[in-house]
């Protein structure tokens, strides 16, 4: 995952958070494909995490950690996307949004550290 790929992954994660948040703000009215939204193995980040390069840049503990939080990130996107598809905010949507935002920031921080190691 070169610098450009890491930057693209960062933008993609920020994009997910923005799409979800603007959905609850009524700005984004898209319908979420929940099957692809929850599939944490289908995105570029998951592909990179399966490669040796990620192990070398992250180390085994950070790599395992980012894999776990990345999976949770996609679960949250699915839960929130389902609420948006139904045009209803669940009782815990604020907590889910806060968790999504926190996980996204943590993923970005880990990716920035990996990018800086590669430079």
Predicted segments — roles?
Residues 1-119:
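N-terminal membrane-sensor/transducer module of prokaryotic signaling receptors
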């Amino acid at each position: 995952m070169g610098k450009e790929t890491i930057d693209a992954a960062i933008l993609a994660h920020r994009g997910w958070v923005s799409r979800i948040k603007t959905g609850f703000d009524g700005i984004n009215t898209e319908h979420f494909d929940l099957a692809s939204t929850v599939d944490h193995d289908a995105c570029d980040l998951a592909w990179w995490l399966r490669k040796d390069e990620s192990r070398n840049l992250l180390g085994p503990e950070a790599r395992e950690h980012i894999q776990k939080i990345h999976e949770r990130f996609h679960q949250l996107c699915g839960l929130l996307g389902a609420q948006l598809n139904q045009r209803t905010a669940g009782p815990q949507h604020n907590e889910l949004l806060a968790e999504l935002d926190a996980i996204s920031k943590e993923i970005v921080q880990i990716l920035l550290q990996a990018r800086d190691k590669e430079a």
